[in-house]
Amino acid sequence: LERSRGLGDVYKRQDYIQVDETTLPVINHDRHKAAKEYIWIVRAAVPRLLFFHYDNGSRSQKVAVDLLKTFKGYLQCDGYSAYDAFENRKDVCLCGCLAHIRRHIESCREENREYAMQGLKLIQGLYNVEYMADERQLSYEERAVLRQRLAGPLLDAFELWLQNTYPKVLKRSLMGKAIAYAYPLIPRMRHYLYDGRIFIDNNRAENALRPMVLTRKNMLFCGNRQAAENTAVICSLLGSCKECGVNPREWLNDVISRLPYYLTPKSGKNLTELLPDRWVGCRQSHDTLPTVPGMSMDNPRTVRR
């Protein structure tokens, strides 16, 4: 696990990532109870890799800045204020998440159904453009052209609706808060119109967090912060297997047998070759692995006495 923690740099070298965070209960031994801490996720869209990051359970802006200080490219996230630190960086382009905007407006249906349905209808129009592009199996370039032609005017209409509706509602109402959340994010949303690689929302990063929710239910909590760090590493590797369509059990069995060779100083091997997205090609060269003294080739985990 210790050697695996440096693999996070591989994910951050991509030029398009999605970032999110979720809670992780960790035992606080001073208070003798589980504290609500946070774990971050960085999802590289191409290649499809995940990196979970735990930094003493913090969700502060400093963690986000330290985590992504070397990243350059498109950064897709929700409206959490910690990401505002990247607003003035010329080498980072913040992209918005329409799913988060939709959830805020959808939460207003009981309070103000008329306005909520108006906003949701405009948002659905933007998603319909994505469905159309998917059905036509458009390339990234073709998708960008379609978005600019159809989604661009819809996004303009949605922005205008936000402007016109806000003065008509109470600022402290659910609708007022939803509009206050959505309107500043419109400039970030526009970036997806011009690059077909960028998704309309951050749902894929959120979906990658769902196993973490199940993990919380199964394990209840992490016993200490070291255990939380180990959890982040394990979730990074196994989550990447799922993203790449690799069987986690097969990957673990094969990689565990290879690690002794890769950790040998004279092997010349790079641990990144064992990441799930590169593992299939690496696996084909299994017969060329160097021999480790005292280790059986039939069973690399068995040391001859």
List where the protein language model places each region.
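Single conserved hydrophobic/aromatic residue that forms the stacking wall/gate
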Residues: 1-11
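Two-metal-ion RNase H-like nuclease active-site motif
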Residues: 13-29, 77
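Beta-sheet entry/capping signal
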Residues: 14-17, 39, 49, 72-74, ...
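Conserved beta-strand -> loop -> alpha-helix junction used to position metal-binding or nucleic-acid-contacting
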Residues: 16, 79, 88-121
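Short helix/loop capping segments that flank catalytic or ligand/cofactor-binding pockets
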Residues: 26-28, 50-52, 61-62, 83-86, ...
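Short conserved beta-strand segments at catalytic cores or DNA/RNA-binding microdomains
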Residues: 33-47, 98, 241
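Electropositive, glycine- and tryptophan-enriched low-complexity nucleic-acid-binding patches
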Residues: 38-76, 104-106, 125-141
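Acidic/histidine-rich catalytic cores and adjacent linkers
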Residues: 70-73, 80-82, 121-305
